[in-house]
Each structure stands twice: as structure tokens, then as C-alpha cells.
From Swiss-Prot:
Region feature Phospholipase A2-like 1, mapped onto this chain: 75-189
Annotated stretches, region: Phospholipase A2-like 2: 315-371
Annotated protein name in UniProt: Otoconin-90
Disruption phenotype: Otoconia show a strongly reduced matrix-calcium.
Keyword Signal attributed: yes
Quaternary structure (record): Interacts with OTOL1.
TM region(s), chain numbering: none
Glycosylation sites: 37, 178, 288, 417
Positions of the UniProt region annotated as Disordered: 444-485
Entry GO CC: extracellular matrix; extracellular region
């Protein structure tokens, strides 16, 4: 059901569009609804013209939204609402302020940052009232023409979470963007005071909602929301075990265009510790070894994922996009960390490793709705000025393209730590991270690019900090020690 709703949001038809080529109901796994039709997908995403648009709006960095939302449908619903009502996209808020970034760094610094802070708190208090996110229930009604969001669900929890989102979008609509606050160094963020970190200091729920209700069915949700929010994001990615024949293709290189947000971010005086390099072409801190790799021909362009046993999946689109975005051969990524190019175990080692884990989970969700990466694909990759776009023909191909494109952009914008290439087996111990648990606890979300102080040891503490926002019951919102990005 999660993926059916995600499909609906991504692929809602435009006027005059052809019927959706949904999977044959007989091919769907047990438990998935066979009542799939056009009207099922009409709703809050009816004004989104394509899969590419919505993921382009998300941007290439994980931010504050990944810390708030635990599933694709609600995340994409919010992104569409924000885009529709405010004309803004999460990509406009990459590393914005102290609260709009993925990890809470300190007190908000402007009105938009306050929006993010209050949206976090609104969801945190909702969890305290046992109101958990249900991807099968999308209650927001978005009117793009009149730029209005309506929350009319009879379920109190649905309406509460919808109202939190409505407040956030309306807050952003009234707040301006201060571009100087993008990629703000965390050292400028002031730690939160005890008053602001206390869950009881000030409730941020919409007016009319009791702070500690004994019965969520009695929650009154009338009244306007006082919350304000600012958005930043990228979405969650994924991987698969299916088998596909290796395909050899050629790709032409183009000259680097140093205009992307990732390159700008790296150019803002950030220093990188030894062994860590950004993979974006055109960034001067790429070492000589990397330049040699970028200058040689690749043996193949498919990204190979080794599954359990002898199974192997050749992901041509992912490999081509990685090559386009970084000018590095896909095989350089295949043995990175605990999850890149393999069925991993333990906590992902860093941002790049988390991109691979997320890609695995994205493909796993596609598999559950009947879209298998191992099938012969008619998808193609367009590469121009180191910008890659995956173009699919059928609905499944478009969704699988979205998984691959998100993964490629996430991996390309992350730092490449040479010490994590082909890591010792002892570093990847324990149980594999469950996609289900990861989505619920936030372990699939990733912070934006690592700072100069980030190393291979930082992943476990990051997971703990993230659980402050997403575990039940959540701990108080606390600022991370200064010095991180």
C-alpha cells in the first residue's frame, strides 16, 4: 500500500494523459490492493507533471524533512504542497540556518528557520500523543489555484499531522529566503536553552489540541495553526537482489560545469581531512589518484550489486549516472562502506554508505509493488554538462529511474573517504539495517555532506542524534555540539 500511494503521488495524470500502466493486479504481491485505477491516484499530486519534476524539487541533499517524515508518501505530499502553495522547493533550503538542515544544530536564526523548528516540534509532540504517520492515509487537500491546504479528515491523528504540515507550508509562504543562510556553518548556531529543549516548555501544536490528551479520539483540531516552517530535503533511495545480465555501453564525457549547488557548497572554504575527497568533477580538492581514475576508460558502466549467494544485479542506469555526475567509473563505488555494491550488515559508515542503503530500500519498495529492477529495461540516461537524467517509458521504469537518479545524486554529492573503500569485514558486523525499521527510526536518512571533522567513526553517534526526533517517545530537541556542519 505504501508504494501504491507513492506511485499515485508521483504519477497522477495530467489532462489528456494516457491511463497509467500500473502492474497487472495478478502480479502484485499478496496484501496489495487490486483495485487500482486512475481515480485512486487523483489527489494532492494531480498537478505534478512528472516523476522528474518532484524529485528535482527535492534536491540532492537530505535535510530537515527526512528527519520529520518516516515514509515516501507523506514526504512527497508535503513537498508537493510546499511547491504548490509557496512556489518554493526543498532544494532552495540546502543546509539552511540551524533548524532547516537534517540535524538540529541550535536555535533558529530567522523566520524560515523558525518554521522548520516548529514543524519538528509539532511532529514530536504528535508522537507523544501516539499519533504516528500512516503512509496509507494522505489527508491533505491541496488547492494549487487558490494556494490553500485543507485538513478535513475525521481521524484526529490524521488531521493533527495534516495541520502540522499546513502550518509549516503557510509559514514558509510568509517567510523570505536569505541566501546567505544556505550552507551556514554550524559554529554560528546557538545551543538551545533548557526552556526550548524541554518538551513541556511551550507546545507548538495547533490551537485547540490538548497538550497531553488521554484519548486521541477526543482531540479538537479546529483553529488555525500557529506553527511556521522552513524546508530542506532530499529523499530516500534504495537497492535490490534481482539478477540482470551485464550490459556494456559507451558514454561520452562532457566538460565540467561548476555551477551546481554541490560545487558551490564545497567551494565555500571547506577544508577536507586527509583521505576524504568530494567526487564532483571540477572541485579542486580531488586528489591526483582520482584525476587518473577520471581520465581512464571504464571497463564497464553498469554498477554491479552482489546479492546473497551468487546472485548479481547490474544496474546500468545507476552506473551511467554516477559516471556522468562524477566522471568516476561505477566500480569505484561498489566496495565502499558496508552497503555499496553488496548486501551489508551493521550501521552504514557515512553519508555515501547511507545513500547505498537507501537505494536498496527504495528498490525493495518498488519490488513490493511489482516493479523489478532485474527485468529488461527500456530506460535511458541523458547526460549533459555533468547533469544526469534517467528517462523511463513505463510507470515501473520511471519509478525505478527515480530510485537510481536519487541514489546517483546522493552518492555524487557525498564525500568519498578512501579509508572506507573495501573496508575490513570486522567493521561491518551485526544485523543488516531493516528498511522497515530504518524508515521508522530515521536510520535511512542522511545528513548533508560531511564537514572536515567527519570521519569513519561518526555514523553511530549520528544515528543516536537522529533518534531524538523520531523514536517513541522522542527525547527533547537538543543541539549537536558545535563544530559539525
Amino acid at each position: 500500500m505504501i508504494m501504491l500511494l507513492m506511485v499515485g503521488m508521483l504519477m497522477a495524470p495530467c489532462v489528456g494523459a494516457h491511463a497509467l500502466d500500473t502492474p497487472n493486479p495478478q502480479e502484485l504481491p499478496p496484501g496489495l490492493s487490486k483495485n487500482i485505477n486512475i481515480t485512486f491516484f487523483n489527489g494532492v499530486f494531480k498537478n505534478v507533471e512528472s516523476v522528474a519534476e518532484i524529485f528535482d524539487c527535492l534536491g540532492s541533499h537530505f535535510t530537515w524533512l527526512q528527519a520529520v517524515f518516516t515514509n515516501f508518501p507523506l514526504l512527497l505530499q508535503f513537498v508537493n504542497s510546499m511547491r504548490c502553495v509557496t512556489g518554493l522547493c526543498p532544494r532552495d533550503f540546502e543546509d539552511y540556518g540551524c533548524a532547516c538542515r537534517f540535524e538540529m544544530e541550535g536555535m533558529p536564526v530567522d523566520e524560515s528557520d523558525i518554521c522548520c523548528f516548529q514543524h519538528r516540534r509539532c511532529y514530536e509532540e504528535a508522537v507523544e500523543m501516539d499519533c504516528l504517520q500512516d503512509p496509507a492515509k494522505l489527508s491533505a487537500d491541496v488547492d494549487c489555484t487558490n494556494k490553500q491546504i485543507t485538513c478535513e479528515s475525521e481521524d484526529p491523528c490524521e488531521r493533527l499531522l495534516c495541520t502540522c504540515d499546513k502550518a509549516a507550508v503557510e509559514c514558509l509562504a510568509q517567510s523570505g529566503i536569505n541566501s546567505s543562510l544556505n550552507f551556514l556553518d554550524a559554529s554560528f548556531c546557538l545551543p538551545q536553552t533548557p526552556e526550548t529543549t524541554s518538551g513541556k516548555a511551550a507546545t507548538l501544536l495547533p490551537r485547540g489540541i490538548p497538550e497531553k490528551p488521554t484519548d486521541t479520539s477526543q482531540i479538537a483540531l479546529s483553529g488555525e495553526v500557529a506553527g511556521e516552517v522552513r524546508a530542506d530535503t532530499l529523499t530516500t533511495l534504495s537497492r535490490t537482489k534481482s539478477v540482470q545480465d551485464l550490459q556494456d555501453t559507451q558514454a561520452s564525457r562532457t566538460t565540467s560545469s561548476p555551477g551546481s549547488a554541490e560545487i558551490i557548497a564545497l567551494a565555500k572554504g571547506t577544508t577536507h581531512s586527509a583521505g576524504i575527497k568530494p567526487l564532483r568533477l571540477g572541485v579542486s580538492s580531488v586528489d591526483n589518484g582520482s584525476q587518473e581514475a577520471a581520465g581512464k576508460a571504464c571497463d564497464r558502466l553498469a554498477f554491479v550489486h552482489l546479492g546473497d549467494g551468487d546472485s548479481m544485479t547490474a544496474m546500468l542506469q545507476l552506473g551511467e549516472m554516477l559516471f556522468c555526475l562524477t566522471s568516476h567509473c561505477p566500480e569505484e563505488f561498489e566496495t565502499y562502506g558496508c552497503y555499496c555494491g553488496r548486501e551489508g550488515r551493521g550501521e552504514p559508515r557515512d553519508t555515501l554508505d547511507r545513500c547505498c542503503l537507501s537505494h536498496h530500500c527504495c528498490l525493495e519498495q518498488m519490488r513490493q509493488v511489482g516493479c523489478l529492477h532485474g527485468r529488461r529495461s527500456q530506460s535511458s540516461v541523458v547526460c549533459e554538462d555533468h547533469m544526469a537524467k534517467c528517462v523511463g517509458q513505463s510507470l515501473c521504469e520511471k519509478l525505478l529511474c527515480a530510485c537510481d537518479q536519487m541514489a546517483a545524486e546522493c552518492m555524487a554529492s557525498a564525500f568519498f573517504n578512501q579509508s572506507l573503500k573495501s573496508p575490513d569485514g570486522a567493521e561491518c558486523q551485526g544485523e543488516p539495517v531493516s528498511c522497515e525499521d530504518g524508515m521508522l527510526q530515521g536510520t535511512l536518512a542522511s545528513s548533508v555532506d560531511s564537514s572536515s571533522e567527519e570521519n569513519s567513526e561518526e555514523a553511530p553517534p549520528q544515528m543516536e542524534r537522529l533518534r531524538r526526533f523520531l523514536e517513541k517517545p522522542p527525547g527533547p530537541l537538543g543541539a549537536r555540539p558545535l563544530g559539525g556542519k
